[in-house]
Amino acid sequence: MMRILLFVATNLAVVLVASITLSLFGFNGFMAANGVDLNLSSLLVFCAVFGFAGSLVSLFISKWMAKMSTGTQIISQPRTRHEQWLLQTVEELSREAGIKMPEVGIFPAYEANAFATGWNRNDALVAVSQGLLERFSPDEVRAVLAHEIGHVANGDMVTLALVQGVVNTFVMFFARIIGNFVDKVIFKNEEGQGIAYYVATIVAELVLGILASMIVMWFSRRREYRADEAGAQLAGTAAMIGALQRLRVEQGLPVHMPDTMKAFGINGGLKHGLAGLLMSHPPLEERIEALRRRG
């Protein structure tokens, strides 16, 4: 909770500085001279409220959404020795990482994957695919679990939700400024908000949204390296590298995990070129090389 409060306070300060900066550069006066009556401070607050609301609501219901979207079955009472081993392993890794035992589940998917989610590092969910359990060795599964525990211990779910809230805020803010500019300055509309405002705002939100997604995904890729490091510390560097190498062997298999969960899975799929800018995970080769350099 302290992380959320500090992050929100920081971004309120950013909003305030942005508003003051625009005012100092005479942006308000320029828009007013062209018939646009905008209160930038009020607009920023409005966008911040709605920008953060969506990402924070998604964060608080993330465990429920994950269970529903992936069909994850929570292990309350282990029925097999594999489930017993899974619970014991997660408990050991959680204790080493200094967090409370998360919920543990298995989701029905052929591809080898796993994810962690939850609004709090002490109230999380870690789940693995059936395919991962069936085809990976115990050491490889343990390394994957350590990676996911690393996400939880690092607070990545909260951090990414807050980063998403920030970019949502500024996408909404600048899209509405562009919409007003097009409507009032270019089309000279003097009565309310015309069709040009709505069209320009929608187009601007789409374009800015893509650019914002690149920022969020860049940040997500940085967090993957940190989770790999945490996994190496908990399970051993050799085991973590072995798990990533095994994932690389299976890289051609389709990833059926919902898009909302891919940022927190260990296997994010494969894209090249510009599409790689929208990937939540770095290439497996780069992750393996980073661990080798770390030693």
Swiss-Prot record:
GO annotation, cellular component aspect: plasma membrane
Family annotation (Gene3D superfamilies): Metalloproteases ('zincins'), catalytic domain
Cofactor: Zn(2+)
Regions that span the bilayer: 4-24, 41-61, 158-178, 199-219
Cofactor note as given: Binds 1 zinc ion per subunit.
Coarse class of the protein's main subcellular location: membrane
Gene Ontology MF term list: metalloendopeptidase activity; zinc ion binding
Residues noted as binding Zn(2+) in the record, renumbered to the chain: H147, H151, E224
Entries under Pfam families matching the protein: Peptidase_M48
Topology of this chain in the membrane: Multi-pass membrane protein
Enzyme class: hydrolase
Active site: E148
NCBIfam families: PRK05457.1
Protein name from the UniProt record: Protease HtpX
